[in-house]
């Protein structure tokens, strides 16, 4: 006796059935993970399940195979593309689809930016019921060779013939068997195979799970996560590799605080912000933007929106090593940078001295995820804020400003520029700033910091009368 089939499954003509032909689906949109989204139609003509299809694009008609089924949705992969989108393009990378580093190489670059802009607008509307008064022109730059920071996994895999060095496979703990990477700078991509051979020759090839890379103006640093000490032969191999490939090795035996340079010792990492005459030294494990070219444009856009004057006191929250603080100091009377890490706060102060702006800057270490209205009041009056939080957003800061506004006790900045790497937390915080703190969302736009991925960076301007 066969099992009864649920009514909803019997009625959905697009629901997967095995055996038999793959179901057909019209793709309507892309979600935040760059998956095509469509909806099945029941035999009664009613909307059925939502299907998320990896590799499908809006406007396409595809067949698909589901690998995860839930009552209201399914996750699937494309089987065949029956009607391709005009936005579809040939991926540049031979490992696209297997490697998890990129998710949008099959989508035309202009369409990628348009999709990200729509994701930003949708988040603002659905989560905060907000529409920006102006949508800024997108910030974009090179599509390839832009990734100046990356964390590569190292795995000694006998079935693959030795050591693999690369990103994880898509939605997997396995390491992609990649020999090049189009989003890494060309000289780094060319090192992937030599790095494999280097690790294979080390005594600790099974005790080195990760290589973190950071590209500076003059040198590329490679941080080796070493679970056991290296021996003299290992040291000789690392020195020879560094000399041949013009890189600097750092070793990390334990936590981030144990990172130390190994060889050579007479070079240092930095990036520059030429528009403001800033040279920014950093260590390879410091947070810096992945895309140096876009970062330069972003800093310029942020400062033009904030429009600091020589009379302004500016507060830079989540200031890191001073990426915005130091340029602001060139244009403002005084800038205070606040960061949650003692290490980064110390680095920011050193960078201010390096660039001769320490007379206009002060720095403090505070937990900005627990800040209150009283904490903001205690800092004194600031004319403008720049907020650049991590993915978690600036919820406590936004609540603190809302509390100050509603109490009427304490000064508020007349202008805020908010740089975001997560559109959903930006929308949440924007809702507080507008609906509870009395600001207007004057403008917002995307920053294509990570081309060929679904990552959405954005910038927003808030003003208060």
UniProtKB/Swiss-Prot annotation:
Active-site residues from the entry: 421 (nucleophile)
GO function terms (MF aspect): 4 iron, 4 sulfur cluster binding; iron ion binding; RNA binding; rRNA (uridine-C5-)-methyltransferase activity
Catalytic activity: uridine(1939) in 23S rRNA + S-adenosyl-L-methionine = 5-methyluridine(1939) in 23S rRNA + S-adenosyl-L-homocysteine + H(+)
InterPro entries: 23S_rRNA_MeTrfase_RlmD, NA-bd_OB-fold, SAM-dependent_MTases_sf, TRAM_dom, U5_MeTrfase_fam
Gene3D superfamilies given in the database record: 2.40.50.1070, Nucleic acid-binding proteins (2.40.50.140), Vaccinia Virus protein VP39 (3.40.50.150)
A biological process from GO: rRNA base methylation
Enzyme Commission (EC) number: 2.1.1.190
UniProt keyword annotations, A-Z: 4Fe-4S, Iron, Iron-sulfur, Metal-binding, Methyltransferase, rRNA processing, S-adenosyl-L-methionine, Transferase
Disordered as annotated region, ranges: 1-22
A Pfam family it matches: tRNA_U5-meth_tr
Binding-site positions, S-adenosyl-L-methionine: 289, 318, 323, 339, 367, 388
Coiled-coil regions, chain positions: none
Binding site residues for [4Fe-4S] cluster: 93, 99, 102, 181
Domain TRAM: 16-80
Enzyme category, top tier: transferase
Family recorded in the similarity comment: Belongs to the class I-like SAM-binding methyltransferase superfamily. RNA M5U methyltransferase family. RlmD subfamily.
Function: Catalyzes the formation of 5-methyl-uridine at position 1939 (m5U1939) in 23S rRNA.
UniProt-listed HAMAP family: 23SrRNA_methyltr_RlmD
Protein name: 23S rRNA (uracil(1939)-C(5))-methyltransferase RlmD
Protein species of origin: Burkholderia lata (strain ATCC 17760 / DSM 23089 / LMG 22485 / NCIMB 9086 / R18194 / 383)
